[in-house]
Amino acid sequence: MQKYVCSVCGYVYDPADGEPDDPIDPGTGFEDLPEDWVCPVCGVDKDLFEPES
């Protein structure tokens, strides 16, 4: 699964790990995150994330 990087702070969302503090289950693809999900580090919207190259 594709990892996504926050263009503001560099946080990497890895679908294999999910986001346990949110709670987002492991295996949840970036496109399946809730629309109101924000970066857990800096709080920006998910539209400021880019696929990791």
Swiss-Prot record:
Binds 1 Fe(3+) ion per subunit. The keyword Zinc-finger does not apply. GO terms for molecular function: electron transfer activity; iron ion binding. Fe cation binds at residues 6, 9, 39, 42. SUPFAM superfamilies: Rubredoxin-like. Its cofactor is Fe(3+). Keywords: Electron transport, Iron, Metal-binding, Transport. Belongs to the rubredoxin family. Rubredoxin is a small nonheme, iron protein lacking acid-labile sulfide. Its single Fe, chelated to 4 Cys, functions as an electron acceptor and may also stabilize the conformation of the molecule. It holds the Pfam family Rubredoxin. Residues 1-53 form the Rubredoxin-like domain. The keyword Electron transport applies. This is Rubredoxin. InterPro entries: Rubredoxin (IPR024922), Rubredoxin-like_dom (IPR024934), Rubredoxin_dom (IPR024935), Rubredoxin_ET (IPR050526), Rubredoxin_Fe_BS (IPR018527). It comes from the Bacteria. Coiled coil: none annotated.
